[in-house]
Amino acid sequence: MATRTVSRAGPVAQETAWERYARPALWSQWAPHIRRVETDAGRIAPGVRGRVFSYAGVRVRFTVERVDEEQRRWTWRVGLGPLVLRLGHEVTAAPGGGSRTRLTVSGPLPVVVLYRPVAAWALKRLVAPAP
C-alpha cells in the first residue's frame, strides 16, 4: 500500500471548488478523465454509491465514506476488480485568495503513481475559473 498527496491552488472561491466536488454531476466538467458519473445522489454524503466512466472505457465503482461540509473534506473508496484506491479530498483557503485543493491517494503503488499526474491535471481545473 502506498500513499501520495497532490495539491493545487487557483483563483476560484472555496465555495465554488467545494460545490464542484460535492455534486457528482459536475465531476466531468473539471476532471478530464471522467466521461460521466452514475449515482442516484445529487450530492456526496456518507454511503453514496455509484460508478465513474472514463474516456478510456474504464468503469469504476465508488462509495463515499465520509463528508464534512463545514471543513470541506471528503473521502471515498474507488474500486476496479481487486484494485481499490482510497481518496481523501479537501478544499481550503489559498494564501492571497482563491482556494487550494489537496488529494491524498492510497492504494497499490503502481496505480497510485500512475494516477498522480492525472489527478494533478484535474485538481488544477477544479480551482480554475472555467474548467
Language-model-derived ranges and their functions:
Residues 77-129:
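Beta-strand/loop substructures that line and gate deep hydrophobic ligand-binding cavities in soluble
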